[in-house]
Design a protein with these regions (language model features):
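Membrane-proximal soluble regions of multi-pass membrane proteins
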Residues: 1-24
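N-terminal beta-alpha supersecondary unit
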Residues: 9-12, 26-51, 165-169
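C-terminal ends of transmembrane helices
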Residues: 18-24, 75, 95, 149-159, ...
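Multi-pass membrane catalytic core of lipid/isoprenoid biosynthesis enzymes
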Residues: 29-47, 86-132, 136-137, 174-190, ...
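Membrane-embedded alpha-helical segments that form the functional core of polytopic membrane enzymes
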Residues: 34-84, 135-139, 196-216
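Alpha-helical membrane-inserting segments
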Residues: 46-54, 67, 71, 124-127, ...
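Acidic (Asp/Glu-rich) catalytic motifs at the cytosolic membrane interface
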Residues: 67-105, 214-233
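Solvent-exposed interhelical
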Residues: 146-180, 217-222
Length: 250
């Protein structure tokens, strides 16, 4: 029962998929970050179904670009937008953290979101769907969430409030780190074996960048920064997927 509650907590928080509602408590939040990567499986499966369907080209590309947003409800894009606003302010650390709390969407957030969707759509037009590509992309979507959860359990927090702090505080960090580190390692090996070593490299570079930016600019991570990382990792892995296909590796 606790396992199902843990999965439900992860899906309720990080997706728009209807799930049974439970009161969050110490037990069902302890390993919620371990269930977070399962959302990547759902998104990847929907992406594969879209890619395999006999749809017109533009409809298929639009579906591929929008499926992650529909399933997650845009929670990570919200963090991406807020972080883009904060970084574009060039203010001090306190100013940036204050912008992250502001519910309004600034001009730079709008510009970055438009640029993000344009780039994502363009990259989707370059992907030729095959079963191998589908499996690789499912693994990529799971990997980015495993790395995101690992960061929440490992990186310092920028503040003592917010979503990331809530999950980090409730988590059994030792177990979460071990589970997600092993999962990430297995995924990296599997992706490399499928010819997707460039996707692994892209994800790890973005993770390194995430740590560097969060520490230097904010003094640690927040829920918004976690969303920023996930969206950046997804875009760069998609670019790497296109590069692998162009290079004849897939």
């Amino acid at each position: 029962m606790i396992v199902l509650q843990t999965i439900a907590v992860a899906f309720a928080m990080f997706s728009a998929i209807p799930v049974p509602q439970f009161d969050w408590n110490e037990k069902n939040m302890r390993y919620a970050m371990c269930a977070f990567p399962l959302i990547g499986v759902v998104i990847g499966a929907a992406w594969c179904v879209c890619g395999a369907m006999p749809l017109p080209g533009l409809a298929k590309v639009a579906g591929s670009a929008l499926i992650p947003v529909w399933i997650t409800g845009g929670i990570h894009l919200d963090g991406y937008a807020d972080t883009c606003d904060a970084l574009s302010s060039y203010g001090d650390r306190e100013k940036k953290l204050e912008i992250l709390k502001d519910p309004h969407c600034g001009a730079f957030a709008v510009i970055r979101l438009c640029s993000y969707f344009l780039a994502y759509f363009a990259l989707c037009t370059c992907v030729s769907f095959t079963p191998r590509v589908g499996v690789l992309w499912v693994l990529a979507l799971v990997l980015e969430r495993a790395l995101s959860g690992l960061a929440v359990a490992s990186f310092p927090m920028a503040k003592n409030t917010g979503l990331a702090h809530t999950f980090a505080t409730a988590a059994d960090k030792t177990v979460v780190r071990r589970v997600l580190a092993v999962l990430a390692a297995v995924l990296c090996v599997g992706m490399a074996a499928l010819g997707g070593w460039a996707l692994v490299l892209a994800a790890l570079v973005v993770l390194w960048r995430y740590h560097a930016v969060s520490w230097k600019q904010f003094g640690g991570i927040t829920g918004d920064l976690a969303g920023w990382f996930l969206q950046k990792a997804e875009l760069w892995m998609l670019a790497a997927l296109c590069a692998c296909q162009w290079g004849g590796l897939l």
